[in-house]
């Protein structure tokens, strides 16, 4: 923990397999946060044996943070705060999380969400790429939650999300009054059960210049897209939906209502997941697999 908080700018931490705890000050076996004050890279050496980091990150001065090929485990955290919490206003180049599993636990462990930006941070890029993210209930915050920040690009690519934000919004992006040119992209993601209590997948109020929603599978949710007139209608392409009763039903008139738009090109098919309860979203329906939707590793039925 002290090595990360005192890292030199641009330092790379290459981790061998094993467990690395960001121990709480109380020395009671729980884990806490580390403040990242300088730009760093944290990566696992072996793709087949990822190191486990127990704890969470507070971005407090770092202008570039890259996390690759690790497991981020919040099960021992002594607070319910987000996996990534931006603490300092100002310019930042990027937060990129790739090839990583992020897991909480029921009743704790990142219970407030995955990422929180409640300062006037102007960020070039926030990206989650090829990540499995699960068991983050979102009690006290939305899953991705930006209240005051701004990102030129916000990307979720080739990710699997399950057991997340059952009663909160999937992506919340308020107007931080910094800029309005964000391109928000959700591509090749498998999203199961998110925002299931009639919440929103896109609670976006900052006037994004473009929202791209492509090549995704969304299943088993009562969510709507948005009830906000400021949410720009996405560019939809090649998406599959199953057991999403409200998502593609427009309930909207005169700039208000319960659901502002739908995916006009939606395909409604059961992907026949192998074992969703255990996090195995292998597609058993050949017709769905051939569409190459969702996270790429689940295309087994093709």
Predicted segments with their positions:
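Acidic Gly/Asp/Thr-rich repetitive segments characteristic of extracellular carbohydrate-active
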Residues: 1-27, 286-295, 299
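Extracellular beta-strand-rich solenoid/capping regions of secreted or surface-exposed proteins
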Residues: 9, 22-41, 50-94, 117-120
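Extracellular beta-strand solenoid repeats
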Residues: 14, 21, 35, 41-43, ...
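Active-site-proximal beta-strand/loop segments in catalytic clefts of secreted hydrolases
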Residues: 16-18, 45, 276
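Short glycine/acidic-rich loop motifs that flank beta-strands on beta-rich extracellular proteins
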Residues: 24-25, 52-58, 75-83, 105-115, ...
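Right-handed parallel beta-helix
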Residues: 39, 63-74, 92-106, 122-139, ...
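Non-transmembrane interaction and regulatory regions of membrane-associated proteins
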Residues: 174-175, 182
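Acidic, glycine- and Ser/Thr-rich low-complexity intrinsically disordered tracts
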Residues: 228-302
